[in-house]
Design a protein with these regions (language model features):
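Blade-terminus and WD-like Trp-Asp/Gly-His loop motifs, strongest in beta-propeller folds
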Residues: 1-6, 48-56, 92-99, 147
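A flexible loop/linker signature enriched in serine peptidases of the S9 family
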Residues: 1, 7-25, 36-46, 60-70, ...
Length: 331
């Protein structure tokens, strides 16, 4: 506000492409080197805003399936969580009078505006109240499982609201895109829709996801469909072993990288009775040069005419004869 600093999101090392952590940085308006704030947290930050007194930077902080509102001194120091807990803050605004409001959602209610005060949050908008009146929403449960190599994997389970103790439910494995993004405590209409139709919904954050640190995100570097496959399968095993899911009534699907990982799933196992893959690629050689991720593909996999074996190895197309799952392909 005093014009002395600019706060911005620093994208990390270019060589790390989309896996690079996003840090909050400030730089003097007179020039010089930037200062990175809160980088020791090993979590992605975003949407920075300098406070009215010029002493702190407010920002959004991803952390293990949540998105919190945090602040850090402009001069550097410890990060303080202004709004924490099991919630997803997608927007915030600090007014000239220091009134702070956030756009917040939780698994069982869509986004609403709340005022931040000494007692916590006070909701000041009620846009969704009328729509939700008389509707039974399903609670969303967190779970953590061990993947094949022992890596802990977090996820979310949504059961039909009228079958919260139901067993042997038809179950859908949903896979998020990115891969560097996360399923979170935000309200997800899709989960509620499927649950209302009688399905249990399993949504894990496999390696490659954000919110769990740089090493966790980069663990799938040039190794797609391997560790992340094990991770989502561990989530499916969890709901089967706990008699939540019917192993003979399983579906899987995702969009973008979620579709790509779905492609790996159906080439590696026949345990799903149906699959939907959307906005994905299957033959990376033929896809080369056709999308806006050219630099990222080359940085991670190399040039296809120089590293052809890897491009073929990672392309689900070359394993298509192993697919037995009925699959809907959406573009």
């Amino acid at each position: 506000p005093d014009g002395n600093f600019v706060a911005y999101v620093a994208g990390g090392k270019p060589a790390d492409i989309w896996y690079a952590p996003r840090y909050i940085a400030v730089i003097s308006t007179t020039g010089g080197s930037p200062q990175f704030l809160g980088s020791d947290l090993d979590r992605n930050g975003g949407s920075p805003q300098i406070t009215n007194d010029g002493q702190h930077v407010l920002f959004l902080l991803e952390d293990e399936g949540n998105r919190h509102l945090a602040k850090v001194p402009v001069s550097g120091g410890d990060v303080e969580r202004v709004v924490a807990g099991e919630r997803n803050i997608s927007r915030f605004h600090l007014g000239s009078s220091d009134r702070l409001v956030v756009l917040e959602s939780q698994p069982t209610y869509p986004a609403e505006i709340s005022r931040v005060n000494d007692l916590g949050l006070t909701r000041i908008s009620h846009v969704n109240d009328a729509h939700l009146a008389g509707i039974m929403l399903a609670p969303v449960e967190r779970f953590t499982v061990s993947s094949a190599d022992g890596t802990p994997i977090g996820g979310f389970l949504t059961r039909p609201p009228d079958q919260l103790n139901g067993t042997s439910l038809p179950t859908l494995l949903r896979i998020h895109g990115g891969p560097v993004s996360q399923y979170s405590t935000a309200f997800r209409f899709e989960w509620q829709l499927f649950a209302a139709r009688g399905y249990a919904v399993v949504a894990a954050n496999p390696r490659g996801s954000s919110g769990y640190g740089f090493a966790f995100s980069r663990a799938i570097w040039a190794d797609w469909g391997n560790k992340d496959f094990d991770d989502v399968m561990a989530a499916v095993d969890y709901v089967i072993e706990n008699d939540i899911a019917d192993p003979d009534r399983l579906g899987v699907g995702g969009w973008s990288y979620g579709g790509i990982l779905t492609n790996y799933v159906i080439t590696k196992t026949g345990r799903f009775q149906a699959a939907i893959t959307g906005a994905s690629e299957v033959n990376y050689l033929s896809n080369y040069g056709t999308d806006h991720y050219q630099r990222q593909w080359e940085a991670e996999l190399g040039l296809p005419w120089q590293n052809t074996e890897l491009w073929i190895h990672l392309s689900p197309f070359f394993q298509v004869e192993k697919i037995t799952t009925p699959t809907l392909v959406m573009v």
